[in-house]
Amino acid sequence: MNIKSLTKIALAMLVGLAAATAQAAQTYLPFTLASNDAGTTAAKLDGTKKALTDNGFEVAGEYSPYAGAYVIVVTNDELKKAAASHSRGGYVAAQRISLTEMDGKVQVSYTNPVYMSYAYRVNSKLAQTSAALKKALGYVQDFGPSEGMDAEDLNEYHYTFGMEYFDEPLELASKGSHDAMVAEIEKNLGAKRSGAAQVYKIDIPGTSQTLFGVSMKAPNEGKKYMDETFIMGEIDFKPLRSTAHLPYEILVKGKEAEALHARFRIAVNFPDLAMMGDNSFMNIMPTPDAIRDVLTSVAGGKSQDDDF
């Protein structure tokens, strides 16, 4: 083999190595900032919803979790198809968009579909959804922690030793059928049991999965650790707000109801949240159990012992 051939082989190997390294290095952040312009949520809300529906999205629900914040939840055919790809894929059916007032401007942001797809082990690029969101709302930057995670890290994500993975959900309750479980949740959310209320409901075609969005407001100070306003006040403190973390979910699969454990659900959206100190997990230590108790009550299940 002559020098020229060896040079070509070496060059090809280097190009292949560079391509593999670039692919392996692709990382994702949990949120996307679409715009940050002067104005108010009231002035921008209708236009935001119209832009979403004009680009193929169906508004599944909306609400204001607290003053200065508004969340719109949408879905589309691509998201529902991805949700149907495995028995617990329903979580990816809901795409959350937030409008947050900060310093005279409104941050319009949304959950990064690709990030959530890998976190929920659906593993779809959701190209149509990502493109439609950018077309409808715009694009400034992705945001969240200082460093993103790649697909493998997201598939196997947990915050630290002893913290739950995606496949370690809360088993809330079981009824005689899927319809009975759905009806129980709808009844209890309608009654605002334990301070919870329904934000949206999405049925996943071709499956026995139904996803509920659940808002949570503490009925009194003693229940503050389940309250969205309290929780977000502790964990969502950066200049770019992550309001689209909300709301939490209950997934009905077959005749059973489950929810992502809050130690996963919070951490996957705030992976750089400190364990101790100001604005840390320590400040919301009772929150995972408090959320579990609310969602269990909504599903008609029995309360469990605290994890800590």
Model features per residue range: what roles?
Residues 2-10:
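Bacterial N-terminal signal peptides that target proteins for export
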Residues 10-18:
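Bacterial N-terminal signal peptides
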Residues 70-112:
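Mid-chain, structured segments of secreted extracytoplasmic proteins
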Residues 108-149:
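Hydrophobic alpha-helical segments and helix pairs
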Residues 207-308:
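A cross-kingdom marker for long, charged
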Residues 97-98, 199-201, 246-252:
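Short, surface-exposed beta-strand/loop micro-motifs that present aromatic residues
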Residues 24-66, 141-217:
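Terminal, regulation- and interaction-focused segments at domain boundaries
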Residues 26, 87, 105, 166, ...:
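Charge-biased, low-complexity intrinsically disordered regions
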